[in-house]
Amino acid sequence: MAIDAATVRKVARLARIAEPEEKLEPLAKELSGILNWIEQLNEVDTDGVEPMTTSVETTLPMRDDVVTEGGDPAKVLANAPKAAKNFFVVPKVVE
């Protein structure tokens, strides 16, 4: 799959990543290579192969759910760059 500089520009804009114009063409080539590799992976016959989430089959110990106070808001927000009324304040990301 071929990716061009215009597609990279559009994806970068959607992801809010500022990329200089001179980097768009090298990024397009790199992304095209990655997508070609993924297409090769899609050609591998995986019929009959069980899906797995880890290479080691283990089970984690279960614990009882316990209700807690949730912590001291002052301690929780101590390292927050910005807080208001016991909440984290973050920049708006949806227009």
Swiss-Prot record:
GO molecular function per UniProt? asparaginyl-tRNA synthase (glutamine-hydrolyzing) activity; ATP binding; glutaminyl-tRNA synthase (glutamine-hydrolyzing) activity
Q: Does the keyword Ligase apply?
A: yes
Catalytic activity field? L-glutamyl-tRNA(Gln) + L-glutamine + ATP + H2O = L-glutaminyl-tRNA(Gln) + L-glutamate + ADP + phosphate + H(+); L-aspartyl-tRNA(Asn) + L-glutamine + ATP + H2O = L-asparaginyl-tRNA(Asn) + L-glutamate + ADP + phosphate + 2 H(+)
EC number(s): the record gives 6.3.5.-
Name the top EC class. ligase
Q: Which SUPFAM superfamilies match?
A: Glu-tRNAGln amidotransferase C subunit (SSF141000)
The subunit field of the Swiss-Prot or TrEMBL record says: Heterotrimer of A, B and C subunits.
Its function, per the record, reads: Allows the formation of correctly charged Asn-tRNA(Asn) or Gln-tRNA(Gln) through the transamidation of misacylated Asp-tRNA(Asn) or Glu-tRNA(Gln) in organisms which lack either or both of asparaginyl-tRNA or glutaminyl-tRNA synthetases. The reaction takes place in the presence of glutamine and ATP through an activated phospho-Asp-tRNA(Asn) or phospho-Glu-tRNA(Gln).
Q: What is this protein called?
A: Aspartyl/glutamyl-tRNA(Asn/Gln) amidotransferase subunit C
Q: Which gene encodes it?
A: gatC
